[in-house]
Amino acid sequence: MKKIIILLTTFFLLSGCTIPRAVFKSSLINQDDPRYNLVEVTPTLKLSAPDTVPKTIVDPVFAANNWHWTSLAKGDVLHITILSSGGAGYLSNNASGDRADFENILVTDSNTVQVPYAGTIPVSGLDVTQLADEIKKRLSRVVLNPQVIVTLTARTGAMVTVEGSGKTGRYPLEQSMNRLSHLLATAVAVENTSTDMMEVHVTRQQHYFTARLSDIYQYPGLDIALQPDDRITLRQVTEYVNVLGAAGVQGKHALVQRHSSVVDALALAKGLNDNLADPQAIFLYKHNEAEQAKQQMRKLNIYHVDMSQPNSVFLAQAIRVDNGDVIYISNASLTDFAKVKAAFDSFLTRGTNSF
């Protein structure tokens, strides 16, 4: 009789207690709440689709291809050979008969070269063949039938700089590497990088160009021609989605692609917790929309996804998740009952063992 009295007393004590919930219930969400609009995700819901074409506007400075990879640039080092049937030995100490050689001719910062008896020659926009023709024309006044050969011995002038997340360093511009995609193929370790989450910045004097690596590979208009002294900065883009509540793994999860969906985010969180989650009560809070709602003084939209429906996966795949968004998974109704039962069983066991 005494045992029965204790058990009944324990039951009535528990009936007056409430078990704290880790998350709120779906029943607490009100369609008419003055603070937000509850938007049901259904096949008829029309949301703005993610941009499939990048909005990057290429500055005309980058669109113009006014420098060719064969053009000489400041810092280049040349070897000039002059041949003449009338003798060229007097042109240089490094001469033999009808041949004179000039080594280590440097293209100066003013884009000129200094050639004995030919004077100072501007080389902007010239390649080695055009420079040889100009030297030949100038020497024809002092040398009989001159023949000029210009060789590029060190390509130290036409260089671009790579910094940031890639293989940093200085890279020469040449025939096989004169566009942005050529350089990125060398400077980026793609096997360890999501091209969708890599941002490329190009600085040219006071002008700037920015695009995602995947867009540069996909859209030819973004594959700009490089010029000497361009500075390329590679930056890994890190974006997160917060998955809270009855998820497999709660917390902040890094997105692995730009246009992620609710399904992608749930996969990062190891799905729903089978023992706790209510698949009918998944809510999406969009960070950008929250900021817009505050600025426009309107109610915030909260999107409700019912993953218990057969077509729910397709609907969830159509809902885009962006950086800073929050996905909340509610507890199932039976979860509270399970907590009460566990607590009651614990008291029951203690009461029985005390006798």
From Swiss-Prot:
- Looking at the UniProt record for this protein, which Gene Ontology cellular component terms does it annotate, in alphabetical order? cell outer membrane; pore complex
Q: Does the keyword DNA damage apply?
A: no
Q: Where is the lipid attached (S-diacylglycerol cysteine)?
A: C17
Where does this protein have coiled-coil stretches?
A: none
> What processes does the entry annotate via GO biological process terms?
monoatomic ion transport
Keyword Ion transport present in the record's keywords: the answer is: yes
Q: Which UniProt keywords apply?
A: Capsule biogenesis/degradation, Cell outer membrane, Ion transport, Lipoprotein, Membrane, Palmitate, Polysaccharide transport, Porin, Signal, Sugar transport, Transmembrane, Transport
Q: Where is the lipid attached (N-palmitoyl cysteine)?
A: C17
Q: Name one Pfam family in it.
A: Poly_export
InterPro entries recorded for this chain? Poly_export, Poly_export_N
> What is the annotated signal peptide range for this record?
1-16
Compartment annotation: Cell outer membrane
GO MF annotations in UniProt: polysaccharide transmembrane transporter activity; porin activity
Q: Which family does it belong to?
A: Belongs to the BexD/CtrA/VexA family.
Q: What function does the entry list?
A: May form an ATP-driven capsule polysaccharide export apparatus, in association with the VexB, VexC and VexD proteins. May function as a membrane anchor for the polysaccharide. Possible porin properties.
Q: Which NCBIfam families match?
A: PRK15175.1
UniProt name for this protein: Vi polysaccharide export protein VexA/TviF
Q: Which organism is it from?
A: Salmonella typhi
Upper lineage ranks? Bacteria, Pseudomonadati, Pseudomonadota, Gammaproteobacteria, Enterobacterales
